[in-house]
Amino acid sequence: MSDIKYELAHVGINAQNPEEAKATAALFAQIFNLQPREGNSSTFAGNAVEVMRTPYLGRNGHIGMYTADCEAAVKDLEERGFEVDMSTAKYKPDGTLNAVYLKQEVGGFALHIVRKP
């Protein structure tokens, strides 16, 4: 059993275009009383729902999982037989790993780990 802790960060939904992304995020925001906001490549409803402006990884979208130490989480996942796609890695300015996707989809969703803020 691993000592690495994971918790849900957000659910990502693939939209076909920016207009659909904005409308989808706005509806989630309205239903759940969340604050909509624009990100670099997506539109958010609060922190829980991310709607991609164009289709991205995962047939249905992605699920982001927080962890305190992404490097340790990558090691943990690989030791347990899960492959990490380092070509998707995002780094903080200080060079520490901030996010990375796994190669495997689950239920049509890509999975990625994100360093907990």
Roles of regions detected by a PLM:
Residues M1-K22, G58-M65, P117:
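N-terminal beta-strand motif that seeds the catalytic metal site of vicinal oxygen chelate
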Residues A21, V74, G108-A110:
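Internal amphipathic alpha-helical segments of the cytochrome P450 catalytic fold
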Residues N14-Q16, M52-R53, A68, K103:
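A structural detector for beta-sheet-dominated domains
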Residues M1-I4, A26, Q30-G39, A48-M52, ...:
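Vicinal oxygen chelate
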Residues R59-A89:
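Mid-chain, well-packed structural core segment of small domains
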